[in-house]
A protein has these predicted regions:
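Conserved catalytic-core motifs of GNAT/GCN5-like acyltransferases
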Residues: 176-177, 192-211
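Conserved acetyl-CoA-binding loop-helix of GNAT-fold acetyltransferases
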Residues: 150-165
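N-terminal amphipathic/basic-hydrophobic helices that include classical n-h-c signal peptides
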Residues: 1-15
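A conserved beta-strand-loop-helix scaffold within acyl/acetyltransferase catalytic domains
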Residues: 80-137, 143-145
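A short beta-loop-alpha structural element at the N-terminal edge
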Residues: 62-78
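Short acidic N-proximal helix/loop "leader" segments that mark the beginning
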Residues: 13-59
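Short, cationic low-complexity segments
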Residues: 222-254
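Conserved beta-strand-loop-alpha-helix junction that forms the acyl-donor binding cleft
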Residues: 173-188
Length: 260
């Protein structure tokens, strides 16, 4: 059933519609829903912003790394969703989980989440996300590279660690990998310490940890970027544009073949 006849357009815009009952909610019913929504949303800590930076890639292209906003989540979801069916290098599970995490952020069903994006001439090149567990501990969620062969994922992961340690001021970050490449990139390259007594949120896998000490030892090798980003360059990172899907899939296949 649709909205009842005789209801003004202005009322339709203001009121919530109960499709099961075939009627608009009363003001009292809407008030109860608002109260329930407030109860369902997790409490949030104040989070310091991540200052945008630019990174010159091996190709000579310049990637802007900046925080994404909740208003950009729908765009990110449209780009991520097709990759959930790509059974290569764990793109399927990483994309599916990242999709759910970003949707939960948009719907206020996750505590203290953030998302950083890498953008080249407006086109999305990669995404990383995570959250604050508490003021001293961070949780790394996912790193998804849409442009392979230029260490986009490695640069974005390093930016994520920079955010946790330097801007959120945390003592350590809990990390797991879902692919052998991820294990090599994070656990070995930094290197990370074992903290297997901590079950990670991603399926309860044993956690590895990046401490402040390890981060600052690795920073000169692994953390890149220049600040501030020129206003014109930063402006070109918005709105986020979708990469060509066919080109992206071919590139992913080619880089995997080169590693085999």
């Amino acid at each position: 059933p649709g909205p009842r006849s005789g209801v003004r357009a202005s009322a339709m815009k203001r009121s919530l519609y109960d499709w099961d009952e075939g009627a608009y909610l009363t003001q009292e019913e809407e008030r109860v829903i608002d109260e329930l929504e407030a109860m369902l949303r997790p409490p949030a800590l104040t989070m310091a912003p991540y200052p945008a930076k630019s990174i010159v890639l091996a190709s000579g292209e310049v990637m802007v790394v900046r925080e994404a906003t909740i208003d950009e989540v729908d765009t990110l979801l449209k780009i991520i969703q097709p990759l959930a069916w790509l059974d290569r290098d764990y793109y399927d599970i990483v994309s599916a989980r990242l999709f759910a995490e970003l949707l939960a952020w948009k719907k206020y069903r996750v505590r203290n989440e953030y998302c950083l994006v890498g953008v080249i001439d407006g086109v999305l090149a990669g995404i990383v996300n995570g959250r604050m567990f508490d003021e001293g501990h961070g949780v790394s969620y996912h790193t998804l590279s849409l442009k392979r062969g230029l260490r986009v994922g490695a640069h974005l992961f390093a930016s994520k660690m920079e955010h946790h340690i330097e801007y959120l001021g945390q003592d350590e970050v809990w990390i797991v990998a879902e692919s052998p490449i991820g294990h090599r990139r994070w656990m070995i390259e930094y290197p990370l310490d074992k903290k297997f007594e901590v079950q990670h949120e991603l399926g309860g896998a044993p956690s590895w940890v990046l401490s402040r000490e390890t981060y600052f030892k690795a920073k000169s090798r692994l953390v890149s970027g220049t600040r501030p980003v020129p206003a014109e360059l930063l402006a070109r990172s918005k709105p986020i544009l979708e990469p060509d899907l066919s080109t992206m899939l071919v590139q992913i296949e080619d880089t995997l073949e080169a590693r085999l």
